Swiss-Prot record:
InterPro entries: FN3_dom, FN3_sf, Ig-like_fold
Glycosylation-annotated residues: 230, 433
Lineage: superkingdom: Eukaryota
Disulfide cross-links: none
Keywords from the named record: Glycoprotein, Repeat, Secreted, Signal
Keyword Acetylation listed: no
Alphabetized PROSITE patterns for the sequence: FN3
Official protein name in the record: Fibronectin type III domain-containing protein 7
CDD domains the UniProt entry points to: FN3
Pfam families: fn3
Species name: Homo sapiens
Length: 733
C-alpha cells in the first residue's frame, strides 16, 4: 500500500504542472496604454496607443458621466463617434484576443471640439452674399471664408463674434463656396460647415424693342447677364400687366392693347433671386379704331362720314369703296370727311388712325346703300285670266322689287329679289294699273316709277252639269259672267278628243265610245284673250264587257271563274246560281274563287263589270254543270295471291270513275265498267306503300283530281301478298 502511494505522487504533480501551463497559455492580453486622445470633429475623439502583442482588436470606451459609448477597432489610432460637441469624456481602452479582453487602461481626459455652425446664405444683391448662423455652444468667435467655387481668385476670410456676416464687392451671377467654423476660449477651432451660394445677376442691358402693329405684339431682346438662368419682361399700363419669361435673350408679349402706353422693364434671375429692374422704357401702341362712326347722305349724292377722336392718334384715313370695286379715300387730322355718291350703290366705309407705331386695327366696316333707281323696260306678259307675269331689267342698288296691281278698289302685291314677279289672284276680265318699285332695306322704295296697264283674260266658265241620255249623247251645262264670249267644251280621253261650241250656256257631244274615261273642261274666249280652262269634270261611259269567260273546277265545292278585263272596269261580280242557292264574289282582279258549290248540278253564271264610279254592265251569261261528286268509303282488299280490289261508294248522281295506285314500284290504273263501284288490279307488287285515289271522270273525259287520297301498305307473305293495312289520308301538296 505504501509503495502504491509513492508511485501516484509524481503523476499528480505532473498533471498539476500541465494544468498550470495550459492556464498560463489562455490568460487575457496585456492592458494597453493610451498615448494621446484628441478631437478634430465635434462628434468624435481619436485615440492613439501602443500595440499589444496577441491582441486582435481593441475596445474604446468614452464616458461623460451620463452616457457610455463603446467602439471596437482593429488597431491604433481608433475613433469613438456619436459624441456630443464641446464635452469632456473619460477615454479608456481594452485589448481583445481569443483568450478574452484585458482590464481597462488608465483613463485619459479629452474634450470634443465645438459644433459646426449651421449656415443660411442668400444674395441680397448682385455683388453681395449674406451668411447667417445660430449661436454655437461654448463658441466665443467665428471664422468665415469665401472664394469662387471654381477655385479661381483669392480667398476672403473674416473673423467675427456676431452670428451674421456680409461679403460685398463680389461678382454678379457667380457661384461662391462659403466655409465657417467656431472657436472656443482656448482658440481651438471647431467643426466647419461648407455651402455654395450664387450671387444674383445684374439687370439686363442693351434692351431693344420691335413692335408689330398688325398683330399687336412686341418683341424684346437684350444682352445676356452673367449667371442669369431666366429673364422676365414686364409691360405695365394703367389697366393691365403683361409678362413673358424665357431662358433666352429675347421674348415676345402678345395681346397688347391698342391706344395704350406701356412701361417696359426686364429682370434677370437665377437660383439666388432676381436682379433689379432694368431702366424702364416707354412703348406706345397703335391707336384704337375710331368709334361712333356716323354716315349721312345730305343732300342726295353727298356722303358725310364723321367719327369720335381717339387717344394716341396723329391723323385719320377714311376709305370708301363702292360695290363696283371703285375706292376713294381722304386724309385728315379732323374727325370728318365728305364724298360724292351715286344712287343704287352700296358703299363700304372704314376709318383708320395712324401714329408713329403704325396703323390702327381694322374697326367696323360700315355699309351705306343709296336709294335704288326705278326699274326700266318693264314688260308685262299675260299668263292667264287670274295671273300676270312681269319682267324687267335689273337695276343697281335694288335688293327687292315690289310689284303692285291696282284695279281702283283692290290691290294685289308681290315682292321678289329677282327682276320678275308673278301677280296671282287677280280678277278675271279686269283692267289693272301695274307698277314695279325698287327697294332696299336702308332707303326703302323708289315711289317715282311709271305704271303699266293691262286687262286680264275672261273668266273661266263653271261646268254645272254633265248628263247622259239613252243614245250615248252627252249634254254639258255651264255658268259664266263674261259678256260676248264664245265657249268651247272639250272631252279629252284615251279614245280621242270630242268638242262642242256655243255662245250660250250649253252644248251637246255625240259618239263617245263605251268603256272610256274623259275629262270635260270648258274655255271662254274674248278679244282680251283666252280664259283658263274650267275645273275638269270626269265623264265615264259604261265599261265594255269582259271577254274569255272561263269556269274551272278546283275542288268538289270550289270553282274558279276567270275572264279578260274590259276597258274602264275596276271590279267584277261573278254569280253562280242554281235551284240549291247562290254563290257570289266581288273582286278587282280578273278571276275569283266561288265556294259552297254543290257537285253534280247545273248552274247559271252571271258576270257584271263595274267602273270606278259605280257604272255597271251586265256582260255575260253562261250555263255551267258542276263536276261529279267524289266517291265515299274508298277501301283496298286483297284479291288472290297477287291482286288488289279497290272499292268505293258512289255519291249523288251517276258518274264514271277512274282509280290510280301510286307506289315506289310503279303506278297502277284501272277503269271499272259503267255503273260498278269497284275495280281490280290483278298484278301488284307486295312490300310497298300505295297512295290510292278514285276520281270522277267528266263527260269530256277529263279526270277530276281533287278527290281525297288514302294511303295503304301492302305486306308480303312469302312471294305473295300479305296484309293490306290502312295508313291514313294523304295531305294535298
Amino acid at each position: 500500500m505504501a509503495g502504491g502511494r509513492e508511485t501516484c505522487l509524481p503523476l499528480i504533480g505532473f498533471i498539476l504542472i500541465c494544468l498550470k501551463m495550459v492556464a498560463s497559455a489562455k490568460s487575457a492580453p496585456e492592458i494597453p496604454t493610451i498615448d494621446q486622445a484628441y478631437s478634430k470633429l465635434s462628434n468624435s475623439i481619436t485615440v492613439e496607443w501602443a500595440t499589444v502583442p496577441g491582441a486582435t482588436s481593441y475596445l474604446l470606451t468614452a464616458e461623460d458621466g451620463d452616457t457610455v459609448i463603446e467602439t471596437t477597432v482593429a488597431n491604433s489610432p481608433g475613433t469613438v463617434t456619436g459624441l456630443k460637441a464641446a464635452t469632456w469624456y473619460e477615454i479608456t481602452i481594452r485589448s481583445i484576443s481569443a483568450a478574452g479582453r484585458s482590464q481597462a487602461s488608465p483613463p485619459k481626459q479629452a474634450k470634443t471640439v465645438l459644433a459646426a455652425p449651421i449656415l443660411e446664405v442668400s444674395s441680397p444683391s448682385s455683388d453681395s452674399i449674406l451668411v447667417q448662423w445660430e449661436a454655437v455652444y461654448m463658441a466665443i468667435a467665428f471664422s468665415v471664408s469665401i472664394m469662387r467655387a471654381n477655385g479661381l481668385g483669392s480667398i476672403w476670410k473674416e473673423n467675427t463674434t456676431n452670428t451674421s456676416l456680409t461679403f460685398t464687392s463680389l461678382e454678379a451671377g457667380t457661384l461662391y463656396t462659403i466655409k465657417a467654423y467656431a472657436w472656443n476660449a482656448n482658440r481651438i477651432p471647431g467643426d466647419d460647415s461648407t455651402c455654395n451660394q450664387r450671387t444674383s445677376p445684374r439687370a439686363p442691358a442693351n434692351i431693344q424693342v420691335s413692335f408689330d402693329s398688325g398683330a399687336l405684339k412686341a418683341s424684346f431682346s437684350w444682352a445676356r447677364a452673367e449667371g442669369a438662368f431666366n429673364y422676365t419682361v414686364m409691360a405695365l399700363s394703367d389697366s393691365s400687366e403683361l409678362t413673358c419669361s424665357t431662358t433666352f435673350s429675347s421674348c415676345t408679349i402678345s395681346s397688347l392693347q391698342c391706344g395704350t402706353e406701356y412701361l417696359i422693364s426686364v429682370l434677370a434671375s437665377n437660383d439666388a433671386g432676381s436682379s433689379k429692374s432694368s431702366s424702364a422704357m416707354t412703348l406706345k401702341t397703335v391707336a384704337c379704331a375710331p368709334g361712333r362712326v356716323t354716315i349721312q347722305e345730305d343732300p342726295p349724292g353727298h356722303l358725310s362720314v364723321a367719327w369720335s377722336s381717339v387717344d394716341l392718334g396723329d391723323y385719320y384715313v377714311v376709305f370708301v369703296k363702292s360695290d363696283d370695286g371703285l375706292e376713294v379715300h381722304c386724309n385728315t387730322s379732323l374727325t370728318q370727311c365728305n364724298f360724292l355718291s351715286e344712287c343704287g350703290f352700296t358703299y363700304f366705309i372704314s376709318v383708320f388712325v395712324y401714329n408713329k407705331a403704325g396703323q390702327s386695327p381694322l374697326g367696323d366696316i360700315f355699309n351705306y346703300t343709296t336709294a335704288p333707281c326705278c326699274p326700266s323696260d318693264i314688260n308685262p306678259v299675260l299668263v292667264s285670266s287670274d295671273r300676270v307675269e312681269i319682267v324687267w331689267s335689273p337695276v343697281r342698288g335694288a335688293e327687292l322689287y315690289e310689284t303692285k296691281a291696282v284695279d281702283g278698289y283692290n290691290m294685289v302685291e308681290c315682292n321678289d329679289t329677282t327682276p320678275a314677279c308673278t301677280l296671282s289672284a287677280l280678277e278675271c276680265d279686269t283692267k289693272y294699273n301695274i307698277t314695279v318699285y325698287s327697294f332696299n332695306e336702308v332707303r326703302g322704295s323708289n315711289m317715282s316709277c311709271t305704271p303699266q296697264f293691262i286687262t286680264t283674260a275672261p273668266c273661266s266658265p263653271e261646268i254645272k252639269n254633265v248628263s247622259r241620255d239613252a243614245f250615248s249623247m252627252i249634254n254639258v251645262h255651264w255658268r259664266s259672267t263674261n259678256d260676248d264670249a264664245t265657249y268651247t267644251v272639250t272631252a279629252q280621253g284615251e279614245k280621242g278628243l270630242y268638242q262642242c261650241s256655243s255662245t250660250g250656256e250649253s252644248c251637246t257631244m255625240r259618239g263617245l265610245p263605251c268603256g272610256s274615261v274623259f275629262s270635260v273642261t270648258a274655255v271662254a274666249e274674248t278679244q282680251a284673250g283666252r280664259s283658263l280652262p274650267s275645273y275638269s269634270v270626269p265623264l265615264e261611259t259604261v265599261p265594255c264587257c269582259p271577254t274569255g269567260l272561263t269556269v274551272t273546277q278546283i275542288t268538289q265545292s270550289v270553282i274558279n271563274v276567270s275572264w279578260t278585263i274590259g276597258r274602264v272596269a275596276q271590279t267584277h261580280v261573278a254569280v253562280l246560281e242554281s235551284h240549291t242557292g247562290q254563290s257570289k264574289c266581288h273582286t278587282h282582279q280578273n278571276h275569283c274563287l266561288l265556294g259552297c258549290i254543290t257537285c253534280g248540278i247545273n248552274y247559271t253564271v252571271t258576270l257584271k263589270a263595274i267602273s270606278a264610279t259605280g257604272l255597271t254592265a251586265d256582260c255575260s251569261y253562261q250555263s255551267y254543270f258542276s263536276g261529279a261528286c267524289c266517291p265515299l268509303g274508298v277501301k283496298l282488299y286483297r284479291l288472290g295471291p297477287n291482286g288488289i280490289r279497290i272499292y268505293w261508294q258512289a255519291s249523288r248522281g251517276s258518274a264514271n270513275y277512274s282509280t290510280d295506285l301510286y307506289g315506289s314500284k310503279g303506278i297502277f290504273t284501272c277503269t271499272p265498267s259503267a255503273g260498278l263501284s269497284f275495280c281490280d288490279v290483278t298484278e301488284i307488287p307486295c312490300g310497298d306503300v300505295y297512295t290510292v285515289m278514285v276520281s270522277p271522270v267528266a263527260k269530256t273525259g277529263l279526270k277530276l283530281t281533287f278527290c281525297p287520297k288514302k294511303i295503304y301498305s301492302v305486306t308480303c307473305s312469302g312471294s305473295t301478298l300479305g296484309m293490306v293495312i290502312y295508313r291514313g289520308k294523304r295531305n294535298e301538296e
